Every structure is written in structure tokens, then in C-alpha cells.
Swiss-Prot record:
Keywords: Antibiotic resistance, ATP-binding, Cell inner membrane, Cell membrane, Membrane, Nucleotide-binding, Translocase, Transmembrane, Transmembrane helix, Transport. GO terms for biological process: response to antibiotic. It comes from Escherichia coli O6:K15:H31 (strain 536 / UPEC). Coiled coil: none annotated. This is Macrolide export ATP-binding/permease protein MacB. PANTHER family: MACROLIDE EXPORT ATP-BINDING_PERMEASE PROTEIN MACB, MEMBRANE COMPONENT OF TRANSPORTER-RELATED.
Length: 648
């Protein structure tokens, strides 16, 4: 008969300083399917080390160990995990149940890593618990169960994937005599069902219940009676089959990892909340700065547009402040007509201006009188609260009409409801009021100077007596590039004048400069916010590292029941990402509250959350979770199962 478990000259040594301490010294042992074997020895005899090697939790330093003819030395970590999952079931002295899972969920764990579908897994767990007399305790947590009940849950977990070989480490060591007898009775039943049962104990009375007692002392076997031949030994109950395959198994495994991660986080609510706090603040900072910064930028740009965008102003001279007399008369009415004929010009309005006195009855104030065309008000986005602008007939006839700004109206007519039709003196010229223009309110503030507008023909012919213009404002048609239009305008006037005796001021250039400045400022503030997100990510990493340390025994349990290193890595990585995603969602909620609060105090601001901003926030959360969760997850996946199980 071929042995199920075959050990030949197994040695295991551990480093102790500069020396190697040999714990197992040439162990040779055969265990057959269906046997009930007890390995007995005093503390320090090497029996636990031998059990770890038998259960593929540890590897021998030298020698050969075969499981059903398969040499385990040739297997990698994942293959060893599969071997544990499909052939071995562990029963520990301290039960090693996961405290945040119910009895039913604890029993299901091995089948999760085997890829068994959820419905099958649930039915099998319930069947095993019912068989062991725990059908009314399936939803109980370990802390709610007695020691004997916890050990029975541990036995059910060992049987979940079939449990061909049951490895029981001091199964009665933490139990009272009655519970211990119940556990031994269950082990005898498992032997009768065809399971191979290996009991590791220091208690001779427990060992005596086995068919074969192997004694180990100082790393050597001192007693090894021959095996009792079993008839029709099957080597265990039917293996669990019908596992999902391909992408379904991957999706199912991911869902289970997500569920387990959520349960682990829910079991430590305060720690989870503290872990999330840094992410909440970081995401809220990033989203708030991006959204509020964008609202501020749009408001600034709107203010700039309110004073005229897509416009080019032409002034005489070389630059602002140039009062050289030879340039004062550079711009003529013929230049205006030539500009208006260009295909890229939507409108062109001249301007002549002079500071004059305005009088009405006994009110006498100083104001800036500006001669313009009717298009001037459209160019600068001005509206009329009363009346209207002057028409072409009034321009051609040098009509004595005037448009007031709202401040001038208030100074001259503080008590009149309607001022259209009233006559005032502009300088020494009487003029009839035909409208009141409202300038757009700007965050840059309003001018304190009172302003009135007359037809440019009236201003130059009747008031100032000059034949030249102080400036020309050109509005570029939609679809034409403003910079290209500025070049063509410069070329046109230079050809007409034979020299460049003027300069231009492009408002689009100002707009682009402001856009660049606000973009740079927003980027800087975003980087500051990203730093807070990075700090939050480091906090996640620190807490997850602590979590790995605290949950070392849990990791060992999962590996013992068949979890691969990749399964452990996936679970802890999902936990980190889950923390960051939930923290990100709370951070977005916080940023929404901040935005709505700001909007209450800043009614002119239009704060909106674009889908892109929300997507970027969740992307940041996910990336943060992956980046800062990878190191703790990797540390967890690299743990040695024997060392992990030994830690408390």
C-alpha cells in the first residue's frame, strides 16, 4: 500500500546567531490514508515543527516529503497553498477563528479561496455546522461561543474543502474534559468516515485514543509502530467540486475579497474612520480648490469680458503716456472708414474725449465727455436703463444729444423718475438726454469719474473743434483670430500713414494673460492640496502597516486554509482602496458643503461640480489607495504562515 504522506530523512534547522540549530534530525515516517495517528512528545521535542511540515506550512531544510506521491520541494508558494487548500484541514489548540466573522462565515473561508460559488459554499457550511450540532449558532461570532463550540467551528472549517488529512494541534488543550471528549469523539467519527487524522499532543491520554502513537524526542522519532492496514480507505470525504472557472471565478473571487475587506473595516470602525480622515481632508481640499478656483477664474474672466473682449484699441503715439505733439493727430476719420471696411471687423467706434463741466439748474459737476458711435455700448457690453443710444442720423447730423452714466444721472437728477428728454449743458453746448447707460459691475471696481457720451461727430465738430480722433476701438468678428487681426490692423494703418505713429492694445492678450495667471495660481493651490492628499495617503499606509502587524495571526490563518500570497495581497490592497474610495466620497460631500456655504456668502459666484472633477477625485482616491496600500499589502503577502500563526 502506498503511503499518503511519506517523509524520508527530513531535517529542519533554524539560524540562531551565527549557528544553525537543528530541530528535526532525520525524520522518516509513512502515514497511510484513513489512519488515526498521534504524534506525542514533550515541549521542544519538534512535534509542532513536524506538523507544520506535514501540513505544508513549512519546508524541510533537507530530505524528501511526498503528499500522494507529489514531492512538495518542487512546488512553489501558490502550489503549496493549493495543496493545503485541497488536502489538509487544520484544527488548532486556540481555535484560530476570525473574530469579525460569524461561525458560518468562518467555515466558508477555505471554500472562498477554492473558488466555490457562494450558494454552494453557504449550503456546505450550514450542512457541516448542522452535522457538528451548531445549526442554531451559525450567526454567532466567536466571542459568543464556548470553547467547545469554537473548536467544532474550527473542525467544520477543516472539513470545508473535503479535509482529506486532518491535522489537529493539541485539539483538547484549551478545553474542559467534557468538551475535550466531544472533540475526540468527532475526530473518531472523521476517522470512521475515511479521513486521515493526525493528532499532535503532549498528553498521553489523548494520544492513547489513536490507533498508532508515534513518539518524538529531541527531534528524533523514538517510537514508530507499524501502520494498521485499512480496508477500503478512501482518504476522506468527497472533495468539493463545481468551482467557478475563468472570468467568473475571477469576478467571484474579487467580490469575496471586497466583502471580506468591508467586514474587516467594519470590525474596526474607529481605526477605519481615523484612516479615512486624511483622505477626506485631502480629497475635499483638492476638489474644493479645483471647483472654487475655477469659479473664481470664471468670475475674473467674466469681469474682464464685461469691459470688452475681442476688441483692439488703437491710440496715437508709441505707447501710453506719449504726448509728443507730432503724434496727437495721427488717427483720422478716414482711418475709421478704412478699418470698418475690413472683412474681419464686426464694428469700429471712434473716441474723442475731453473733461467738461455739466450743468442742470443749480447743479454743476465735472465729467468726462466722450464722443463715440452707437456701437460703443455694444462693444463694451453696456445696457440702457432708460432710453437708447444715438442713431446714424444723429451721428451724421451732429445732433446735440447725450447719454449719461448712472452716476451722472444720480448727481444731476436725484429726484426725477424719467430723465429722457431733459436738457443739460455739456460745456457750453445744450444737449438733450436720450438715454442712461448702465456699466457692468466689475470686481475691479467702478470709476469715480462721471461719464457722458455724445455722437463723435458732435463732440469733435461742436464741442472740441478738432478733426482727429483720440482713439479707435475695433471689435473683431467671431471666428477670426484676434492676434492675426491686430497684425492686419497694424499693417493697414502703417501703410496709410507711411509710418507707425500709433500703438494697439489687444484685450484678448490681457484675457490670455489673466487666464494663464489664474491657471498658474490654481495649479499652485492644487499642488498644495495634493500635498495634503499625499499626507493622507501616508496616513493610510501607516495605519495599514499597523493593521498588518495587528492581523498577522489572521493572515496566518488564511494562509493555513489555502489563501495564496496573491489572495492576501489582493485583500489588503482592496481594503486600502476601499478606505480611500469611501474617504474620497466623504471628501467630495464635504467639498460640496464647502461650495454651497461659499455660495451663500458669495452670491455672484457660480460654483459647479463638473463630472470630470468628480471622476478625477475618485481616480485620485483609487490611485492613492493603490500606491499607499501596496507596501502594507506586500508585507502581508510575504509573511511566513508558520511565523504568522505563532504571533498573538
Amino acid at each position: 500500500m502506498t503511503p499518503l504522506l511519506e517523509l524520508k530523512d527530513i531535517r529542519r534547522s533554524y539560524p540562531a546567531g551565527d549557528e544553525q540549530v537543528e530541530v528535526l534530525k532525520g525524520i522518516s515516517l509513512d502515514i497511510y490514508a484513513g489512519e488515526m495517528v498521534a504524534i506525542v512528545g514533550a515541549s521542544g521535542s519538534g512535534k509542532s515543527t513536524l506538523m507544520n511540515i506535514l501540513g505544508c506550512l513549512d519546508k524541510a531544510t533537507s530530505g524528501t516529503y511526498r503528499v500522494a506521491g507529489q514531492d512538495v520541494a518542487t512546488l512553489d508558494a501558490d502550489a503549496l497553498a493549493q495543496l493545503r487548500r485541497e488536502h489538509f484541514g487544520f484544527i488548532f489548540q486556540r481555535y484560530h477563528l476570525l473574530s469579525h466573522l460569524t461561525a458560518e462565515q468562518n467555515v466558508e473561508v477555505p471554500a472562498v479561496y477554492a473558488g466555490l460559488e457562494r450558494k454552494q459554499r453557504l449550503l456546505r457550511a450550514q450542512e457541516l455546522l448542522q452535522r457538528l450540532g451548531l445549526e442554531d449558532r451559525t450567526e454567532y461570532y466567536p466571542a459568543q461561543l464556548s470553547g467547545g463550540q469554537q473548536q467544532r467551528v474550527s473542525i467544520a472549517r477543516a472539513l470545508m474543502n473535503g479535509g482529506q488529512v486532518i491535522l489537529a494541534d493539541e485539539p483538547t488543550g484549551a478545553l474542559d474534559s467534557h468538551s475535550g471528549e466531544e472533540v475526540m469523539a468527532i475526530l473518531h467519527q472523521l476517522r470512521d468516515r475515511g479521513h486521515t487524522v493526525i493528532i499532535v499532543t503532549h498528553d498521553p491520554q489523548v494520544a492513547a485514543q489513536a490507533e498508532r502513537v508515534i513518539e518524538i524526542r529531541d527531534g528524533e522519532i523514538v517510537r514508530n509502530p507499524p501502520a494498521v492496514e485499512k480496508v477500503n480507505a478512501t482518504g476522506g470525504t468527497e472533495p468539493v467540486v463545481n468551482t467557478a472557472s475563468g472570468w467568473r471565478q475571477f469576478v467571484s473571487g474579487f467580490n469575496e475579497a471586497l466583502t471580506m475587506a468591508w467586514r474587516a473595516l467594519a470590525a474596526n470602525k474607529m481605526r477605519t474612520l481615523l484612516t479615512m480622515l486624511g483622505i477626506i481632508i485631502g480629497i475635499a481640499s483638492v476638489v474644493s480648490i479645483v471647483v472654487v478656483g475655477d469659479a473664481a477664474k470664471q468670475m475674473v474672466l467674466a469681469d474682464i469680458r464685461s469691459i470688452g473682449t475681442n476688441t483692439i484699441d488703437v491710440y496715437p503715439g508709441n505707447d501710453f503716456g506719449d504726448d509728443d505733439p507730432q503724434y496727437q493727430q495721427a488717427l483720422k476719420y478716414d482711418d475709421l472708414i478704412a478699418i470698418q471696411k475690413q472683412p474681419w471687423v464686426a464694428s469700429a467706434t471712434p473716441a474723442v474725449s475731453q473733461n467738461l463741466r455739466l450743468r442742470y439748474n443749480n447743479v454743476d459737476v465735472a465729467a468726462s465727455a466722450n464722443g463715440v458711435s452707437g456701437d460703443y455700448f455694444n462693444v463694451y457690453g453696456m445696457t440702457f436703463s432708460e432710453g437708447n443710444t444715438f442713431n446714424q442720423e444723429q451721428l451724421n447730423g451732429r445732433a446735440q444729444v447725450v447719454v449719461l452714466d448712472s452716476n451722472t444721472r444720480r448727481q444731476l437728477f436725484p429726484h426725477k423718475a424719467d430723465v429722457v428728454g431733459e436738457v443739460i449743458l455739456v460745456g457750453n453746448m445744450p444737449a438733450r438726454v436720450i438715454g442712461v447707460a448702465e456699466e457692468k459691475q466689475s470686481m475691479f471696481g467702478s470709476s469715480k469719474v462721471l461719464r457722458v457720451w455724445l455722437p463723435y461727430s458732435t463732440m469733435s465738430g461742436r464741442v472740441m473743434g478738432q478733426s482727429w480722433l483720440n482713439s479707435i476701438t475695433v471689435r473683431v468678428k467671431e471666428g477670426f483670430d484676434s492676434a492675426e487681426a491686430e497684425q492686419q490692423l497694424t499693417r493697414l494703418l502703417s501703410l496709410r500713414h507711411g509710418k507707425k505713429d500709433f500703438f494697439t492694445w489687444n484685450m484678448d492678450g490681457v484675457l490670455k494673460t489673466v487666464e494663464k495667471t489664474t491657471r498658474t495660481l490654481q495649479l499652485f493651490l492644487t499642488l498644495v492640496a495634493v500635498i495634503s492628499l499625499v499626507v493622507g495617503g501616508i496616513g493610510v499606509m501607516n495605519i495599514m502597516l499597523v493593521s498588518v502587524t495587528e492581523r498577522t495571526r489572521e493572515i496566518g490563518i488564511r494562509m493555513a486554509v489555502g489563501a495564496r500570497a496573491s489572495d492576501v495581497l489582493q485583500q489588503f490592497l482592496i481594503e486600502a482602496v476601499l478606505v480611500c474610495l469611501v474617504g474620497g466620497a466623504l471628501g467630495i460631500t464635504l467639498s460640496l458643503l464647502i461650495a454651497f456655504t461659499l455660495q451663500l456668502f458669495l452670491p455672484g459666484w457660480e460654483i459647479g461640480f463638473s463630472p470630470l472633477a468628480l471622476l478625477l477625485a475618485f481616480l485620485c482616491s483609487t490611485v492613492t489607495g493603490i500606491l499607499f496600500g501596496w507596501l502594507p499589502a506586500r508585507n502581508a503577502a510575504r509573511l511566513d504562515p508558520v511565523d504568522a500563526l505563532a504571533r498573538e
